[in-house]
Amino acid sequence: MKFLFDYFPIICFFVAYKFWGIYIATAAAMVVSALQVAIYWIRFRRFEKFHVITLIFILLLGSFTLVFHNAIFIKWKPTIVYWIFAIVLFGSHFFGKHTLVHRMLKEKIELPAKTWSRLNLSWALFFLILGVLNLFVVYNFDTNTWVNFKLFGTLVLTLVFILGQAFYIARHAQNLKMNSR
């Protein structure tokens, strides 16, 4: 369910684009992203960092897209967000006792330190590559192809990557804790 909630602004963007074009889709994504952050706050009394970072950039680059009537700004948004995640993940190797992925999953899984490090680096590399792929599609294909890639391409790539990570974790897990929070 959380996965659908996380992808809801992208799905709304996609539907709005198919019916009304890039500018209405951009405005819709801005509104839905703000609603997403608000709903999460109302339900859990805290902010999900991923949602807030995405909201900041959708509002900033979405505004530029609408004011300057140029879709390149909104097309760059995924790359900027992906690269921020990559930098934060990579940087977590040097700041703090544990990597970011370790901090996020340590309550559920016990892994050797080297495995946590590899997982963290693989996520950083994944986000770096997603950012590059987004730019490749932006500059080599039309807007319709980019919108389809943004929803379906990144979704499939993310699911395949998560599946690969699950196999890697299962192979190296010392103790799986079945807490669901």
Curated annotation (Swiss-Prot):
**Whose protein is this, by species?**
Coxiella burnetii (strain RSA 493 / Nine Mile phase I)
Localization, UniProt: Cell inner membrane
Name assigned to this protein: Inner membrane-spanning protein YciB
HAMAP family, per the entry: YciB
A Pfam entry, by short name:
IspA
What membrane topology is given?
Multi-pass membrane protein
NCBIfam families per UniProt? ispZ, PRK00259.1-3
Q: Which UniProt keywords apply?
A: Cell inner membrane, Cell membrane, Membrane, Transmembrane, Transmembrane helix
